[in-house]
Amino acid sequence: MKFLRLLILYFLFLSFHIYGQSVSFKTYMNPVIPGDHPDPTLTKIGDYFYTSGSSFNPTPKIYRSTDLVHWEVIAQPVSASWPEYGDEPGGGIWGGHMVFYNDVYWHYFGRGGETGGGIMYFSTAEQPEGPWSVPTQVQVPAGLFGLGVDNSIFIDEDTGKWYLLTKAGESNNHLVELGNDGQPTGVVLDLTWLNPGPAPYPYGWAEGPVMWKYKGYYYYSFAQHLYGEQYVMRSDTLTDDESAWTIVGDNIFTGTPGTYNRPNHISPVVMLDDSTSWTIAHSYHSNSNWYAHGRQGLLCQVTYNDQGFPVIQYPPSSPVQAPDLPSSGIPWMVPKSDMFDATTLSPNWSFLGYTSSATYSLEVQEGWLYLEPYGESNTIIQNDGEHNFSLITRVDFEPQSTSHEAGLWIMNGTETHFAKIYSTVNSEGNKAIAFSFEGTKYEVENAIGSIVWLKLVRNEHNMSGYFSPDGSSWTQIGEDINALTLDIKQPPPPDYNAFTGNQQGLYVKGKYAYFDLYIYRDAYTDIIAKNPTNRYGVSSASTYLSGINNDDWAMYAGVEFGGNTDYPKTPVSFGIIASSASSGGIVEVWLDSIDTGTKVTECNISSTDSLDNYQVFTSEMEPVSGRHDVYLKFTGIGTDELFRIRLFKFLTEGDSITSIEDHASRQMPQDFGLMQNYPNPFNSSTKINFTLPKGSKVELIIYNQLGEKVMAIAQGEYSAGTHQLYFFADNLASGIYYYGIKASSFSQMRKMVYLK
């Protein structure tokens, strides 16, 4: 019956595909793979490009693209049920490089972690989508004490030989020749002269080695560490003779750093038919408050200087020229909604560590995901890489204990912080729904029953939780929770919050549950305009999208409209909060691409007399179903800023615009303020809150008793609202310290006491 209803809905909305398409535009914004994509590799095979990298505890993925900008997950080369996988944050799979050699697809990777780590493996397949073989351990050639884990493959097309580039400690760089069976032949090129000891080593770890050829030269590039410099050397002969290689001792990244300001760990460079060259690098966000999104995947163009060495511009904070490549309709790489209508789980979903295949199924109950704990818990996850979205699920769960949970969560890579909403049992033994993060928890009794809708909304670091009996009328649980510690950089120990990136998904604890669907970005929940996935011309201000002029646009990826049995919603109108001090303009709403996609509505924005005076504007639209990348194209006349946008959403029949109006008038802090740190006195770390009635450039400095600057814990633009920072004092002496803030014309100083 479910299939029949889906078929009817498909024909009803035939003109709007369930999975929309995006074309390649002339420009793009990094990251092209938001969220964790560390140690990336890149391979061109035919008309396709493939990338993979370190996944650590989550199951690894292979991504495919035709244009280097839009990527899709096509396979998992290592199964979560592989007995050697382990279950250790920061363990699991290190590196990962898929290549095509001798008519076979090979995926080489390292097994990291404290237990069972430091070993290289490969798996094989007849096609990149799999199925992939059980991994085979790579044998260590005589004379080498190990192969390391952060490695890659180089195929010399001129000789037909292929090599494993190994890194097993600071000084141990080698090129290991491989045979047709994927195992070392015994021929090893020794590059230990590259980064000789003892410490300090000239190039740090000299890790993540990659190679490529260009105009007859071999290029060997390596990273200083997981962030930092990127170095390169070249030779016209593939040899381990030091005298044959010329090393560039400076960072090959140059220019002005942007939002992602410490890129390195580049992939092998690929050259296109138009002779342009490209690589994928990784980098943290420049704002340490977003470090825990991980080392994100950045597409960078490579040029060569007069001496023939590669040069890469730091990725700017603005759009850049895209490769001249055709798009195949792949949407932007953000987490994918899933109605669980297939018989096998999509490769978009990863597990955490070793997970028995008996703990999940899409066939126990048609159209639902069955998930049971493996040990204490179980989860399916995707990258958490954006700043605003709304997660929705419908869960069928019969908890019998306060330790039983089933719901949605966002977690950090070290698996120590969890923002979650879930079905459970309260201390009185009654069914309940809870929303929590760290020590803050809100709970209400569940009067709906075993099947309940849950929604978790992220608006930057603020989380909010909701529940519903029908997926239409939602009730918030408690208040918003500031989850900054989920996202912020934290030094080791205890968390090392930046090494592995945040994840989001579904989870169970203590007992099995059924999940009917997973929605990533709900069309009917506020979509914050300042956080587009891709954009042209416009810019992001503290609380709004600004700099809007004629022919500018902004894209919001992976918007789920439903229109199916699982989520039977259909929009009838479009609502937007905007302001204009000019004659205004028009917002065109396109699905999947501009001009070649489908325009579903036009919304006229008239003057509101002031850019600070926001009003609600609406327009009718045709029905839409499925998941789409939504583009807002802006048109108008004149050179002045046409308008500003705070948020938008789509409305169903009978929906009220009230929620949008409420947001427009939402109370922001009325004054600047700096709160007393908590706890005070403190040991190791303390929280410092401050409020901003408007977006401002903030400087928050720690001083010692002599008034000398110790460190800055905030320097940069912050949006209006309440903000929370963490101050870590592990390296300081006990005593009295002061902290002061400057924001706009406001300044204030407070005292705190640190006791080791």
Give the label of every model feature segment:
Residues 1-22, 661:
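Bacterial Sec-dependent N-terminal signal peptides
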